[in-house]
Amino acid sequence: MKGIISQVMGPVVDVDFKDYLPKINEAIEVKYDVEGIQKRLVLEVAAHLGDNKVRTIAMDMSDGLRRGLEAEALGAPISVPVGKKVLGRIFNVTGDLIDEGEPEDFETRWSIHRDPPSFEDQSTKSEIFETGIKVVDLLAPYAKGGKVGLFGGAGVGKTVIIMELIHNVAFKHNGYSVFAGVGERTREGNDLYNEMKESGVLDKVALTYGQMNEPPGARNRIALTGLTMAEYFRDELGLDVLMFIDNIFRFSQSGSEMSALLGRIPSAVGYQPTLASEMGKLQERITSTKKGSITSVQAVYVPADDLTDPAPATVFAHLDATTVLNRSIAEKGIYPAVDPLNSTSRMLDPQIVGEEHYKIARGVQAVLQKYKDLQDIIAILGMDELSEEDKLVVERARKIEKYLSQPFFVAEVFTGSPGKYISLEDTIAGFKGILEGKYDDLPENAFYMVGSIDEVLAKAEKMKA
């Protein structure tokens, strides 16, 4: 059905139809030329203004758009390519390839607006998703089909952890990943693509980008584009998929811009009144079903470090685990720079992970906490003033700190050390030995940047020689 553009206000476009009213979320296509260049713009219906007038949000820049242009309602929401052919490619919000690679014919396309799995389809089992990263698996394990918040400032290693997870899912779980770049820097998107190419994980991941310079419609809907691709892998191929959203805050931010442009009355701190329901709609689709699972890792930017800001606060309600990266740990040269005392997980429960895992994780945290409490005394009076018992705690804590570091596969290029994947059993056994004092006689440095405890012993032997 054809309509006519009647008003253009930046990313908001009004379209008049004759004897037809497109549904909410239906896609409308406009083809026009600007200075001889053919352009195609996709609009999405956001509001009905009358019996045959709709207000839409543009999915790309509306430069050159003018009143009186013809617009065609496509009769369905935006649909994007799905299936194995999307791996190794970069897409925009409407499912067009933007990596300047070979054009591709995609047989299957799915709508980006989908219902979450029904109660009957959802899996209720609490299972751990093994990542092969010691600090994560031991202290803040991820739930299969769960949601993880990744917190950290600039340059502490968020991207490296994301790439390592993609690598481990690809090579150890034989699974696929989807990365949605939501309102982040174009340079970061480019770097990520090139780094993935270099580290050999690109053909196991689909990338969808809606960057900072794009209109709010594209930045908001790009999360749904990526999620739709992940849902296909889960529902049709029965796989366990990893879904990365960087950054989930920008999803709320772009929703707030759209809401203001559509003339809705703002809510707390200027956010959209529908913030919680929009977030819920997205997060409810990320879950385990009886066929497969989508486990998501979402980078969370906290504006002005205010955790009570409505955007991050709304995200917290959905998270099963948090992985907090700490600059002071990165400064010690310990990577991944995960904060062992501030990272949390609802999976760290004796009924889920078992009594032994729980005890050792809590034991490790207790030793690290005691060390933290003693640091002021050490700084003022020195180690010699501590009791023998406290000295032992400090020695073990330093070994634990070092042993929480590990060489990554994707960082081989700049560390020169081969990457390590450590199974949960080996991780538990290693830390159990440290807590029980089995390795009290080994030098601290033997624990730094190694995989399993056997490597610590081998390294200690080498150091003796």
UniProtKB/Swiss-Prot annotation:
Molecular function in Gene Ontology: ATP binding; ATP hydrolysis activity; proton-transporting ATP synthase activity, rotational mechanism
Membrane topology type: Peripheral membrane protein
EC top class, as a word: translocase
Positions of disulphide bridges: none
Keyword Membrane recorded: yes
Translocase keyword on record: yes
Binding-site residues, ATP: 152-159
Keywords for the protein's UniProt record, in alphabetical order: ATP synthesis, ATP-binding, Cell inner membrane, Cell membrane, CF(1), Hydrogen ion transport, Ion transport, Membrane, Nucleotide-binding, Translocase, Transport
EC numbers for this chain: 7.1.2.2
InterPro entries: AAA+_ATPase, ATP-synt_VA_C, ATP_synth_F1_bsu, ATPase_a/bsu_AS, ATPase_alpha/beta_chains, ATPase_F1/V1/A1_a/bsu_N, ATPase_F1/V1/A1_a/bsu_N_sf, ATPase_F1/V1/A1_a/bsu_nucl-bd
Catalytic activity: ATP + H2O + 4 H(+)(in) = ADP + phosphate + 5 H(+)(out)
Gene Ontology, cellular component aspect: plasma membrane; proton-transporting ATP synthase complex
Principal subcellular localisation of the protein: membrane
Annotated function: Produces ATP from ADP in the presence of a proton gradient across the membrane. The catalytic sites are hosted primarily by the beta subunits.
Family, similarity comment: Belongs to the ATPase alpha/beta chains family.
Subunit structure: F-type ATPases have 2 components, CF(1) - the catalytic core - and CF(0) - the membrane proton channel. CF(1) has five subunits: alpha(3), beta(3), gamma(1), delta(1), epsilon(1). CF(0) has three main subunits: a(1), b(2) and c(9-12). The alpha and beta chains form an alternating ring which encloses part of the gamma chain. CF(1) is attached to CF(0) by a central stalk formed by the gamma and epsilon chains, while a peripheral stalk is formed by the delta and b chains.
Protein name: ATP synthase subunit beta
